[in-house]
Amino acid sequence: MEVTSQERSVCAVLGDYHIPDEAAVLREYKGISVTDPRHHPSLSKAKTCLDRSIYMLKICVALFANRQREMDILQAVTDNVRYFLGRVRDAAGGCDEALRDLIRETARYSPHISPRIGERLLAVLRVRYPGYAPSGGPWEGLMEDSIPVWCSHHMTQLRDEERVLECFVERSGTVYSLSKFCSLASELFYEDSLWHRLPDPEFIRPYNLAVFWVGVMKKFESVLAKKLVDDHLTCYTTVAKYDIAAACEAVRRCGERRASGVTLELVDWLRWKLRDFGVDSNDSHASEIISVLQILRGNHLV
């Protein structure tokens, strides 16, 4: 009986600039193995390679699509920053002047926003609650490594502080998903028992959420600047091309099961299409290759 691959967990959750855990991708990829019902070794290899390449190309499709949406995602994050700055202004009274320019500047994303926004948010805090503001040295803004400073000093006593930090600390296996950040922000916002234990929750709640989204903005800017998506795409497109080439070779060497002319035409088309497939391709290119692989897999390797 042929072993079919189960639904892959990484493919099921890709979206919103989600960079998958590379170890999980490779583990699922290596777990794909298909045995031809007639135990024909060449066909077993061809089917395994095709299924593995389809899996890897689906990862690439999502990453290509998310890379094309980078500015849209940054704008969505900036909109969240601006929304909570507006809530802070409504609650802050005497901080209107300090916030007016920030609210105007965050109407549209710009890389010029983030260098000083942490410093300016801290100035708002010093006006409202000077005793809570960090001291003892120059403030360099809300960088990734200063999120713990926020958790320690910005009037928050988060029950799940470590979970918040997990979203920002970069390590092997970390994923960056806008939907994940939105979910966590929603949980924080509606944690009434948390905010009502603190003084002036009408100010503290939106202030902390504004700081949170500034951290998200800086995290995505860091991911873009380091070209982390391109690094993953370089790996995954290379692996997919290797598997497709191996599958094509296995089809040609299928022994007594001589490949039909139509099958060989598909193989030749794939080889031609793969010549210019790589990190600079797009989701349409990858999807087109997946469609042909599925035709080859479903109609010609049975």
Swiss-Prot record:
InterPro entries: Herpes_BBRF1. It comes from the Viruses. Belongs to the herpesviridae BBRF1 family. This is Uncharacterized gene 49 protein.
